[in-house]
């Protein structure tokens, strides 16, 4: 704002000098020396205006950049402070939209609209205070016309606020639908439902187009009204000055100044009106941003550190959990997971295996019952200390874009190359890494340049480097090659003597050597024991095991 005002002062000085030169020339009073001096002053005033204008742009840029950085940092810190189950409740597309375009809109609000708002109030008062010495009548007419633009802005604001709130709501909804359909495109293709979803998206896109056109129409009408008021007000001021000059009530210098400076009364407010539309869009975005920032974080009551130095024992007591009231996912579950053993959970799809993992990891919170880790209630354990002692290797392990070293050191930031290679050796990846550039090997997002088995082995190596006390494998061997599956299973068998291991598996052959097999059905524990004990019992486990064995034999014959 200050630099804008300095630029205005430079403009006033240049207008005065230029007007004086014209007046002196009109009355034949301009000497060569005075012309040179006045020319130098004019150039200096114009240079001051240009310099101040440049500094104003720079100040606006630095202010808006700082606001943008601070807002995105606040959003990141807010999401980082939330427990994972609360983060999962947030819409991914909504977060992306408010953190990207929403913040960009607010950047304009803070970087341009607010400085222009204060300058728009200061500029007419400065010009009035200067021009009043030449003609009070013309100066007061110009000043009276100035409030007409803010009045039009206030009138438009009432319409714009509701319209832009609706616009952003539809925009975020369209983004959510697009992301959901894109992520589920393969499933839609399989079930031949993609055409239906395409039509639904066409309707949403058309709805968004209509609301966008309404916003543009409102903005164009508002701009036209402000142009009429701005240039109409300037024309009235100039006409009044000319009439006073005709009646010998205003000097040549004065009339030229009014001609040159009348528009300066209105240009700042006219620019404010232009920024206003973007600012209102940013205001609508800010409602979404501050709704996220004001979301209460689910905090733990008297959180304590997780005490797990060597052995971890897990006790589950009367556990109940459901995603909806109609269908419970876990019902009255009671069991113990003993330290330094391999405990495997099996069952049909939808029996509650992965739900149990989400409860063990704290991604979801049980409605009833408790989970105890070494006697400590999971609800009272500090999440940071908990995740230092527990590692999860899921069927969808994520590989980040960057070097292999960067991916590995996420588990241990100060890990040496020797420690990383030691972990890679245990999953039979060390030689592959050496042959492909070593630890500086570039990995694509989601490990696009690795096979599914290599991704899982890399995830296991990363978990090993983390050196947790409790390892949870959630379908870690599903949909990978036989070699990688055997490497992972052999490692788990060797590793179970040192750590507590929980494994979720749909393939029962992987559970044969487990110390304890837990069979789930509709969220309940229906059988428990070793492979031998459960086969002798001839219950649900034995039936599923035999069915899978028969299917695998049929597949082998078909592939032979």
UniProtKB/Swiss-Prot annotation:
SMART domains, per the entry: AAA (SM00382)
CDD domains named among the record's database cross-references: ABC_6TM_AarD_CydDC_like
InterPro entries associated with the record: AAA+_ATPase, ABC1_TM_dom, ABC1_TM_sf, ABC_transporter-like_ATP-bd, ABC_transporter-like_CS, P-loop_NTPase, Type_1_exporter
One Gene Ontology MF term: ATP hydrolysis activity
Residue span, ABC transporter domain: 314-547
Keyword entries, A-Z: ATP-binding, Cell inner membrane, Cell membrane, Membrane, Nucleotide-binding, Transmembrane, Transmembrane helix, Transport
Entry annotated with the keyword Cell inner membrane: yes
Transmembrane segments: 2-22, 32-52, 108-128, 138-160, 168-188, 223-243, 249-269
Gene Ontology cellular component list: plasma membrane
Binding site for ATP: 347-354
Membrane topology: Multi-pass membrane protein
Matching Pfam families: ABC_membrane, ABC_tran
Compartments in which it is found: Cell inner membrane
Boundaries of every ABC transmembrane type-1 domain copy: 1-281
UniProt record similarity statement: Belongs to the ABC transporter superfamily.
Name assigned to this protein: Uncharacterized ABC transporter ATP-binding protein HI_0663
Source organism of this protein record: Haemophilus influenzae (strain ATCC 51907 / DSM 11121 / KW20 / Rd)
């Amino acid at each position: 704002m200050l630099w804008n005002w300095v630029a205005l002062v430079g403009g006033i000085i240049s207008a005065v000098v230029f007007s004086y030169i014209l007046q002196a020339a009109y009355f034949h009073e301009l000497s060569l020396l005075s012309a040179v001096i006045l020319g130098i002053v004019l150039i200096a005033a114009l240079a001051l205006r240009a310099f101040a204008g440049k500094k104003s742009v720079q100040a606006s840029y630095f202010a808006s950049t700082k606001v943008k950085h601070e807002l995105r940092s606040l959003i990141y810190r807010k999401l980082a402070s939330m427990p994972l189950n609360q983060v999962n409740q947030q819409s991914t597309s909504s977060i992306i939209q408010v953190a990207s375009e929403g913040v960009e809109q607010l950047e304009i609000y803070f970087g341009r609209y607010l400085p222009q708002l204060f300058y728009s109030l200061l500029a007419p008062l400065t010009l009035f205070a200067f021009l009043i010495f030449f003609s009070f009548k013309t100066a007061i007419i110009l000043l009276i016309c100035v409030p007409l633009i803010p009045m039009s802005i206030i009138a438009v604001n009432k319409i714009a606020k509701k319209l832009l709130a609706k616009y952003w709501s539809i925009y975020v909804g369209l983004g959510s639908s697009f992301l959901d359909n894109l992520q589920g495109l393969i499933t839609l293709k399989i079930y031949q439902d993609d055409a239906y979803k395409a039509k639904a998206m066409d309707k949403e896109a058309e709805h968004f187009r209509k609301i966008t056109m309404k916003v543009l129409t409102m903005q164009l009408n508002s701009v036209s009204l402000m142009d009429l008021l701005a240039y109409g007000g300037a024309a009235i001021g100039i006409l009044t000055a000319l009439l006073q000059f005709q009646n010998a009530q205003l000097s040549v210098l004065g009339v030229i100044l009014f001609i040159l400076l009348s528009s300066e009364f209105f240009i700042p407010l006219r620019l404010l009106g232009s920024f206003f539309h973007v600012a209102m869009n940013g205001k609508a975005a800010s409602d979404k941003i501050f709704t996220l920032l004001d979301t209460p974080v689910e905090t733990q009551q008297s959180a304590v550190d997780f005490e797990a130095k060597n052995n971890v024992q897990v006790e589950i007591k009367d556990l109940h959990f459901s995603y909806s009231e109609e269908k419970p996912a876990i019902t009255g579950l009671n069991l113990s997971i003993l330290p330094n053993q391999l405990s495997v959970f099996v069952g049909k799809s939808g029996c509650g295996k992965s739900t149990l993992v989400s409860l063990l990891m704290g991604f979801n919170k049980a409605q009833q019952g408790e989970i105890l880790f070494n006697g400590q209630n999971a609800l009272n354990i500090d999440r940071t200390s908990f995740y230092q002692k527990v590692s999860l290797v899921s069927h969808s392990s994520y590989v980040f874009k960057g070097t292999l070293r960067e991916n590995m050191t996420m588990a241990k930031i100060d890990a040496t190359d020797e420690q990383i290679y030691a972990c890679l050796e245990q999953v039979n990846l060390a030689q592959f890494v050496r042959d492909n550039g070593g630890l500086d090997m570039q990995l694509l997002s989601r490990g696009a340049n690795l096979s599914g088995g290599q991704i899982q082995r890399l995830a296991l190596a990363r978990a090993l480097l983390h050196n947790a006390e409790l390892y949870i494998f959630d379908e870690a061997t599903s949909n990978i090659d036989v070699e990688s599956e055997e490497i992972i299973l052999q490692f788990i068998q060797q590793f179970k003597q040192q750590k507590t291991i929980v494994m979720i598996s749909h393939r029962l052959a992987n559970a044969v050597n487990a110390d304890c097999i837990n069979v789930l059905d509709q969220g309940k524990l229906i059988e428990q024991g070793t492979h031998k004990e459960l086969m002798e019992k001839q219950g649900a486990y034995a039936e599923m095991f035999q069915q899978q064995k028969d299917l695998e034999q049929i597949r082998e014959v078909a592939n032979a």
